[in-house]
């Protein structure tokens, strides 16, 4: 089970986008990386295709998961732990002790 999943609200802990928050849109567990909407934007040169025209486009680059943390209810970053509730393994916020997913 992953500590950070698609759809989680996260905050960036280090780097040029430190302090910015966003939603995880993709997780790459084999590379330990995640893509966050609107964070770590890079410019890519797009070759012309039938569907798209040529030009420079902005897109999100991936971040290492050690550089992001889930946002707790109070808006501060929290670590993630695991607990068994009703025979089911769930993620728990270390800061508040609340279950992250039902």
From Swiss-Prot:
It comes from the Bacteria. One of two assembly initiator proteins, it binds directly to the 5'-end of the 23S rRNA, where it nucleates assembly of the 50S subunit. Pfam families: KOW, ribosomal_L24. One of its GO terms (molecular function) is rRNA binding. NCBIfam families: rplX_bact. It comes from Agrobacterium fabrum (strain C58 / ATCC 33970). One of its GO terms (biological process) is translation. This is Large ribosomal subunit protein uL24. Part of the 50S ribosomal subunit.
């Amino acid at each position: 089970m992953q500590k950070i999943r698609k759809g989680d609200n996260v905050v960036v802990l280090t780097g040029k986008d430190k302090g910015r928050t966003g939603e995880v849109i993709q997780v790459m567990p084999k590379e330990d990386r995640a893509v966050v909407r609107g964070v770590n934007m890079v410019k890519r040169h797009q070759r012309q295709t039938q569907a798209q025209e040529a030009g420079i486009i902005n897109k999100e680059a991936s971040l290492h998961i050690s550089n992001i943390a889930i946002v707790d209810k109070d808006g501060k970053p929290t670590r993630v732990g695991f607990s068994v509730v009703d025979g089911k393994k769930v993620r728990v916020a270390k800061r508040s002790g609340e279950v992250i997913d039902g």
